[in-house]
């Protein structure tokens, strides 16, 4: 659960700039349970 702590309660624009931490582990900001979190890999949730 602590792994998904990249873009949790951030805005879509802030999530894009705050996903630098996830970028290091090849992770992307995704939407999970109606909230933004760091995904393990580029999932199919490629929604803008």
Swiss-Prot record:
Q: Which GO terms describe its biological process?
A: chromosome condensation; sperm DNA condensation
Keyword Nucleus listed: yes
Tissue specificity statement from the Swiss-Prot or TrEMBL entry: Testis.
Matches recorded under PROSITE patterns: PROTAMINE_P1
Q: What does this protein do?
A: Protamines substitute for histones in the chromatin of sperm during the haploid phase of spermatogenesis. They compact sperm DNA into a highly condensed, stable and inactive complex.
Q: Which gene encodes it?
A: PRM1
What's this protein's name? Sperm protamine P1
Which family is annotated?
Answer: Belongs to the protamine P1 family.
Q: According to its UniProt record, where is this protein mainly located? A: nucleus
Q: Does the keyword Zinc apply?
A: no
One cellular-component annotation, GO: nucleus
The Swiss-Prot or TrEMBL record annotates one GO molecular function as: DNA binding
């Amino acid at each position: 659960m602590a792994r998904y702590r990249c873009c949790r309660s951030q805005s879509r624009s802030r999530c894009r700039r705050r996903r630098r931490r996830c970028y290091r582990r090849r992770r992307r900001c995704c939407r999970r349970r109606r909230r933004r979190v760091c995904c393990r890999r580029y999932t199919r949730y490629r929604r803008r």
